[in-house]
Amino acid sequence: MPTPESAAFLAKKPTVPPTFDGVDYNDTKRLKQAQDAIIREQWVRVMMGRLVREELSKCYYREGVNHLEKCGHLRERYLQLLSENRVQGYLFEQQNHFANQPKQ
């Protein structure tokens, strides 16, 4: 069962998507919200990788000599998350932003 979200948490939860689409760069409040949302999403992915790493270490300890065959799925998932999910920041995306254009 998911943990209920408090009013204080909901007040700080971002209301903008983690992208610069539709953000007016002169509106500093909306720009900062978009930056925070992007950083937050990157950290969520990093923390997901950390959780998989913790489960992998528990599996290695639990399985002992059979860890190579018993923990393979966690190892593959962790290596995939490790290569994809890094905190990169928002500056490159902000400075090189191209609006989504329809494909022709």
UniProtKB/Swiss-Prot annotation:
The family line of this record is: Belongs to the complex I NDUFS6 subunit family.
Q: Organism's domain of life?
A: Eukaryota
Q: Which residues form a coiled coil?
A: none
One CC-aspect GO term: respiratory chain complex I
Q: Which gene encodes it?
A: nuo-12.3
Organism expressing this protein natively:
Neurospora crassa (strain ATCC 24698 / 74-OR23-1A / CBS 708.71 / DSM 1257 / FGSC 987)
What does the subunit comment say?
A: Complex I is composed of about 40 different subunits.
Q: Which InterPro entries does the UniProt entry name for this protein?
A: NDUFB10
Instruction: Provide the topology term for how it sits in the membrane.
Output: Peripheral membrane protein
According to UniProt, the name of this protein is: NADH-ubiquinone oxidoreductase 12 kDa subunit, mitochondrial
Q: What does this protein do?
A: Accessory subunit of the mitochondrial membrane respiratory chain NADH dehydrogenase (Complex I), that is believed not to be involved in catalysis. Complex I functions in the transfer of electrons from NADH to the respiratory chain. The immediate electron acceptor for the enzyme is believed to be ubiquinone.
Compartment(s): Mitochondrion inner membrane
